[in-house]
Curated annotation (Swiss-Prot):
Protein name per the record: Small ribosomal subunit protein uS4
Region: Disordered, residue numbers: 21-47
Top-level taxonomy: Bacteria, Pseudomonadati, Pseudomonadota, Alphaproteobacteria, Candidatus Pelagibacterales
Transmembrane segments: none
Keyword RNA-binding: yes
CC per GO annotation: small ribosomal subunit
Encoding gene per record: rpsD
Gene source species: Pelagibacter ubique (strain HTCC1062)
Length: 205
């Protein structure tokens, strides 16, 4: 098991939830956190604890984004017009690693980030190797020609675990997608309950 997969499973156990809805999640086998104290007694969580859990779930889902980067995304969301929670989700879904994952070019957000880091992805014909790159509406994201035969991409596309959401237009044959529009929160196909309002409360303390 690679360090990346091990870390992903650890996130599931730490948050006590099958975060990505994967059938092989270790949380399907045990409902307690990692480590020798994972089976300890559970007290009633505080408001702070509930808000923190909501933040950790959202951070974890998008590839365990580090705290500094996630806080910066939140700050950007507060400066945009409209609902801050909707803005936060929109910014997260516009990350290039999120789009590659939603396009089903990868089975996880982590492997999407790897594809990008290794130069396999093009945005409007240009190489972009930063997973946090923010795409715009009508941007075309595609796998570069030399990488279109990669088995990991074909395996991901063949998987029936997920469907491509409506705000991404997939050309599966050419391994290309168009980012049609920024989605609303209720359009995002989360396999678990996400609560961006609690994340906003956490940072507003």
């Amino acid at each position: 098991m690679t360090k990346r997969i091990s870390a992903k499973h650890k996130i599931d156990r730490r948050l006590k939830i099958n975060l990505w809805g994967r059938p092989k999640s270790p949380f399907n086998k045990r409902d307690y956190g990692p480590g020798q104290h994972g089976q300890g007694r559970k007290g009633k969580p505080s408001d702070y604890g509930i808000q923190l859990q909501a933040k950790q779930k959202l951070k974890g889902y998008y590839g365990n984004i580090n705290e500094r980067q996630f806080r910066n995304i939140y700050k950007k969301a507060t400066m945009l017009k409209g609902d801050t929670g909707e803005n936060l989700i929109g910014l997260l879904e516009r990350r290039l690693d999120s789009v590659v994952y939603r396009a089903r070019f990868s089975t996880t957000v982590f492997s999407a980030r790897q594809l990008i880091n290794h130069g396999h992805v093009r945005v409007n014909g240009k190489k972009v190797n930063i997973g946090s790159y923010v795409v715009k509406e009508e941007d075309i994201i595609e796998i570069r020609d030399k990488s279109k035969q990669l088995a990991i991409i074909d395996i991901a596309l063949a998987s029936k675990e997920r469907e491509t959401p409506e705000y991404i237009n997939l050309d599966e044959k050419n391994k290309k997608v168009t980012f049609v529009r920024t989605p609303k929160f209720d359009e995002v196909p989360y396999p678990v309950i996400m609560e961006p309002n609690l994340v906003i409360e956490y940072y507003s303390r």
